[in-house]
Amino acid sequence: LLYSIIEVREEEKRKLLAETCDQQYWILKAPLIVVFVADHRRWCDLYRAAGCTPRKPGLGDAWLAMSDANIAAQNMVIAAESFGLGSGYIGDIIEQHERVKEALCLPDEVFPACMLVIGHPSEQQKQRKKPARFHRDYIVHTEVYHTMEPQVHQHFFEERALRNETPVVDFPAQVEAFWKRKYESVFSREMNRSARAYLAAFAEETEEEKR
């Protein structure tokens, strides 16, 4: 058990999370807001309670804990759906390290993996057509990872667009627009800065590793 769940109920704290998560104030309407955190503090405290002297958690420990937290979050999504509830992942919880860490009182061995908002979907949302995803051949590799040629990327990009009834008019321009909106955006840079701050506590070399 390498994760914990923080249910956020206080209105002011909800507002802060909505603000730090890219000003997504619709979050405030959700009946349930939960933050899944990768948690090594619990085990370190448990070890100490038993008289052990735990080593400092490393990047591998952080990676494993983050996987645990995300798996638990997806299980909550599936469970919620079985009750007719809708959910949404808020990846922006990784941003604004200082403010989120203070608001949730996170020790150094604990950091957010994701945030979920859960509520009752409207009829319009229930009837909304799901967008087509990329073809499985673009996602699933056999035996080893296969690096694809530019024309292969374009083929699968255009193939998905056709199934979504939004034909690609200018492939380079559309990809560039997405690149600017997501990969090169202000929030993306802030997310990476914040992630480095969270993981700094796990990235320090131990004396054993230095040897």
Task: For every predicted segment, state its role.
Residues 1-211:
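Acidic, surface-exposed loops and disordered segments
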